[in-house]
């Protein structure tokens, strides 16, 4: 029987040099569906020879109304760096690219948390940050979903809700 894990992850490859992902700057932590998130990553060639690195931006939808992939590649760049050189790599993510088809088959960008992952391969994530798409982030005193918040139930106690859960293995 074979394992569901791939032999080589997406983005896996060989290099004669090494790279360090030092930090990332995000244009915003709260974005709207019409926005474009800009992520700037500081990349340094820490090896002794020049080389190229594929900097990849993945997105993970933390909570979704429908089943979504564990992570999706949304942007990448392949800079060339000399030994010891540091470069800022800019990746752009139009938030509309997070759209999915909901249960009523409408294409929507759901409000909620999305984890932005920066790495060299799908299984080699170096930097992570959570952003929030929508009007306001989830707070500790309200349990929110795209169409309903718990504080709405307190205002309208006769309202009925249906709760659905999707559990994922892995990340």
Give residue ranges: language-model regions.
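Intrinsically disordered, low-complexity Pro/Gly/Ser/Thr-rich segments with frequent PxxP/GP/PP motifs
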Residues: 65-101
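Intrinsic-disorder/low-complexity, polar/charged segments enriched in Ser/Thr/Lys/Arg/Asp/Glu/Gln
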Residues: 36-38, 86-90, 126-128
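Short, hydrophobic/aromatic beta-strand segments
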Residues: 50-57, 68-69, 102-103
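Secreted, periplasmic, or luminal enzymes acting at the cell surface/secretory milieu
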Residues: 1-52, 58-60, 83, 111, ...
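Compositionally biased low-complexity segments at domain edges in trafficked proteins
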Residues: 143-166, 170-171
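Terminal connector regions
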Residues: 94-140, 149
């Amino acid at each position: 029987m074979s394992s569901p894990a791939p032999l080589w992850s997406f983005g896996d490859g060989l290099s004669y040099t090494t790279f360090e992902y030092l930090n990332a700057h995000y244009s915003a932590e709260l974005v709207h569906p019409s926005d474009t998130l800009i992520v700037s990553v500081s990349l340094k060639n820490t090896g002794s020879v020049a080389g190229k690195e594929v900097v990849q931006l993945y997105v993970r939808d933390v909570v979704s109304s429908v089943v979504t992939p564990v992570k999706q590649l949304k942007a990448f760049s392949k800079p060339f760096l000399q030994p010891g050189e540091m470069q800022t790599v800019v990746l752009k993510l139009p938030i509309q690219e997070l759209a999915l088809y909901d249960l009523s088959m409408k294409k929507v960008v759901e409000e909620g948390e999305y984890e932005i992952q920066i790495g060299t391969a799908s299984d080699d994530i170096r930097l992570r940050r959570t952003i929030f798409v929508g009007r306001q982030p989830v707070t500790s005193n309200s349990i929110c979903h795209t169409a309903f918040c718990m504080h709405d139930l307190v205002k309208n106690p006769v309202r009925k809700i249906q709760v659905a859960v999707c559990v994922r293995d892995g990340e």
